[in-house]
Amino acid sequence: MRVIGLMSGTSYDAIEAAAADLTLDGDSLLLRPLGHLSVPYPDDLRALIAATLPPAATTTQAVCALDSGIGQAFATAAARALRELCAGAADLVVSHGQTMHHWVEDGVVRGTLQLGQPAWIAEETGLPVVSDLRSRDVAAGGQGAPLVGLTDTLLLRALPGTPAALNLGGIANVTVVAPGAEPLAFDTGPANALLDAAVRHFTGDGAAYDADGRRAAAGTVSPELLRFLLADPYYRRPAPKTTGKELFHLPYLLRALDAVPTPATDDVLATLTRLTAVTVADACRAHGVTELVASGGGTRNPVLMRMIDEELPGVPVRRSDDLGLPSDAKEALAFAVLGFLTVHGLPGTHPSATGAVRATLLGSITPGLAPLRLPAPVARPPHLLRIV
């Protein structure tokens, strides 16, 4: 089955589209990547997303406009992927949409909202669309995140020791696969979320991120600011757990800066970069990780990757590209896998990874132009993911 996966993370800068041929072969899921592309959000849509995200107030009119606008942007990305990556022929589109709110109270996820109306994608491509992949896990008592955990688990099972997959997006998350134990997946804390917010704030929106970590490299870590940030109760909560920009946003950072002697801008960026490295390393040490496989936009920040290396001496860190899974496309491919599992009647989560009471089939299906015909249900889920 040829599947297109679409993803936009908490950095909300672009839609990542990836295509793959997926085939079940015994206890293995075979994945042949067909390529990936990145489609930036239009400036006005990105500005509306930024103006609507927590802690901002909004209106139902803005939510409706976003649902249509994001759906249309995802439809454009899907059409490009269909044309440029699939030579015009595919079977399924899987759309994560854009997370606008992840509702957490006292550590319990009450709901999650991803916008991007899938009807626009189905109409543009003519293909069936699997979307809204997080809500079913939440309804089953889970965190609804991180959903890359199942794909990570299938990939890591072939590695020795206790490997972990690390995704460095707006939020950092890890999946740990220890021998003889159920897989564990959780958000460790902010990756690019606070960094990007700080850069935009201090440059008056003149820059969106710290390119190559150059400004962090020019700064010095503030012990007072780092200590204050590490005191956040989130880091002491047990896994599985999830977080997002509902917690780690610009006002959160500004409150922290008000509480300590104010560092220079580059020192703030150095401290935030070190915060990500420390919280990732703490999570890995707590679970005996022996190897780290990293992906996501944060892997392009050499200063962040160096700091993670420094915090985890003796633990090799490599990119998912080394395993055949392109780092920039990994999340989009992971959602392609989840949609493939859904249409084959297979669950897309491990309860140990999300905290749900059961493994659930994920998402809702929007038919394409042709009558909806699903594959025959498969009795046994795959045990391994092989990149071919």
Could you tell me what each predicted segment is?
Residues 2-3, 104-112, 119, 123, ...:
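Phosphate-binding/catalytic loop of phosphoryl-transfer enzymes
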Residues 8, 13-24, 178, 197, ...:
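Catalytic phosphate/nucleotide-handling subdomain of diverse soluble enzymes
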Residues 14-33, 38-41, 184-277, 281, ...:
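Conserved ATP-utilizing enzyme core subdomain
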Residues 52-66, 207-214:
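Short glycine/proline- and acidic residue-enriched helix-loop micro-motifs
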Residues 56-116:
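Short beta-strand-loop/turn "lid" adjacent to the catalytic site in phosphate-handling enzymes
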Residues 75-83, 152-157, 258, 274-285, ...:
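Generic structural signal for well-ordered alpha-helical scaffold segments
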